[in-house]
Protein backbone atom coordinates (compact mmCIF):
# COMPACT_ATOMS: atom_id res chain seq x y z
CA UNK A 1 0.00 0.00 0.00
CA UNK A 2 1.26 3.49 -0.76
CA UNK A 3 2.08 5.96 1.97
CA UNK A 4 -0.67 8.32 3.13
CA UNK A 5 -0.60 11.71 1.37
CA UNK A 6 -1.06 13.61 4.62
CA UNK A 7 2.20 12.14 5.95
CA UNK A 8 4.24 13.20 2.92
CA UNK A 9 7.23 11.42 1.37
CA UNK A 10 9.85 9.75 3.57
CA UNK A 11 13.44 10.84 3.07
CA UNK A 12 16.31 10.42 5.51
CA UNK A 13 17.41 13.75 6.98
CA UNK A 14 21.11 13.16 6.27
CA UNK A 15 20.31 12.55 2.60
CA UNK A 16 18.03 15.60 2.43
CA UNK A 17 20.82 17.79 3.81
CA UNK A 18 23.27 16.44 1.22
CA UNK A 19 20.76 17.06 -1.59
CA UNK A 20 20.07 20.64 -0.46
CA UNK A 21 23.80 21.33 -0.20
CA UNK A 22 24.42 19.93 -3.71
CA UNK A 23 21.55 21.95 -5.20
CA UNK A 24 22.67 25.27 -3.73
CA UNK A 25 26.32 24.75 -4.74
CA UNK A 26 25.41 23.27 -8.18
CA UNK A 27 27.76 20.35 -7.44
CA UNK A 28 27.61 17.51 -10.01
CA UNK A 29 29.59 15.05 -7.86
CA UNK A 30 27.58 11.89 -7.00
CA UNK A 31 25.97 11.79 -3.56
CA UNK A 32 26.80 8.52 -1.80
CA UNK A 33 23.97 7.00 0.24
CA UNK A 34 22.95 3.77 1.90
CA UNK A 35 19.35 4.95 2.23
CA UNK A 36 17.51 2.81 -0.32
CA UNK A 37 14.22 3.50 1.47
CA UNK A 38 14.19 7.24 0.76
CA UNK A 39 11.73 8.54 -1.80
CA UNK A 40 12.88 10.59 -4.77
CA UNK A 41 11.66 14.19 -4.50
CA UNK A 42 11.61 16.92 -7.18
CA UNK A 43 14.69 18.61 -5.63
CA UNK A 44 16.78 15.59 -6.68
CA UNK A 45 16.10 15.94 -10.43
CA UNK A 46 19.37 16.29 -12.33
CA UNK A 47 21.54 14.93 -9.52
CA UNK A 48 23.49 11.68 -9.55
CA UNK A 49 22.98 9.63 -6.41
CA UNK A 50 25.18 6.60 -5.72
CA UNK A 51 22.84 4.07 -4.07
CA UNK A 52 24.34 1.12 -2.19
CA UNK A 53 23.20 -2.30 -3.40
CA UNK A 54 24.89 -4.33 -0.66
CA UNK A 55 28.21 -4.62 -2.45
CA UNK A 56 28.93 -1.32 -4.19
CA UNK A 57 27.38 2.06 -4.89
CA UNK A 58 25.38 2.15 -8.14
CA UNK A 59 25.19 5.63 -9.74
CA UNK A 60 21.59 6.64 -10.44
CA UNK A 61 20.90 9.78 -12.50
CA UNK A 62 17.55 11.14 -11.31
CA UNK A 63 15.08 12.21 -14.01
CA UNK A 64 11.56 13.60 -13.65
CA UNK A 65 9.91 10.21 -14.30
CA UNK A 66 11.56 8.81 -11.15
CA UNK A 67 9.87 11.24 -8.73
CA UNK A 68 7.74 9.35 -6.21
CA UNK A 69 9.72 6.11 -6.45
CA UNK A 70 12.24 4.81 -3.91
CA UNK A 71 15.99 5.01 -4.53
CA UNK A 72 16.38 1.26 -4.00
CA UNK A 73 14.22 0.50 -7.04
CA UNK A 74 17.00 1.67 -9.33
CA UNK A 75 19.89 -0.23 -7.72
CA UNK A 76 19.29 -3.99 -8.11
CA UNK A 77 20.65 -6.15 -5.29
CA UNK A 78 20.67 -9.49 -7.09
CA UNK A 79 22.48 -10.45 -10.28
CA UNK A 80 20.77 -12.95 -12.57
CA UNK A 81 23.31 -15.09 -14.41
CA UNK A 82 20.83 -17.33 -16.20
CA UNK A 83 19.80 -20.90 -15.58
CA UNK A 84 22.24 -23.75 -16.00
CA UNK A 85 22.51 -25.07 -19.56
CA UNK A 86 21.15 -28.53 -20.36
CA UNK A 87 24.04 -31.00 -19.90
CA UNK A 88 22.49 -33.57 -22.25
CA UNK A 89 22.48 -31.14 -25.15
CA UNK A 90 26.17 -30.29 -24.64
CA UNK A 91 27.35 -33.93 -24.86
CA UNK A 92 26.03 -34.41 -28.40
From Swiss-Prot:
UniProt record, GO biological process: ribosomal small subunit assembly; translation
Protein origin, superkingdom: Bacteria
The protein, known as: Small ribosomal subunit protein uS19
Transmembrane segments: none
Disulfide bonds: none
An annotated Gene Ontology molecular function: structural constituent of ribosome
Organism: Tolumonas auensis (strain DSM 9187 / NBRC 110442 / TA 4)
Family, similarity comment: Belongs to the universal ribosomal protein uS19 family.
The keyword Ion transport belongs to this UniProt entry's keyword annotation: no
A GO-annotated cellular component: small ribosomal subunit
Keywords for this protein: Ribonucleoprotein, Ribosomal protein, RNA-binding, rRNA-binding
Function in brief: Protein S19 forms a complex with S13 that binds strongly to the 16S ribosomal RNA.
SUPFAM superfamilies linked: Ribosomal protein S19 (SSF54570)
Stored HAMAP family: Ribosomal_uS19 (MF_00531)
Amino acid sequence: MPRSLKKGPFIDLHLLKKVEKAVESADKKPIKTWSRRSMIIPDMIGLTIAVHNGRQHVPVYVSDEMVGHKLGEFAPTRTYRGHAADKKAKKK
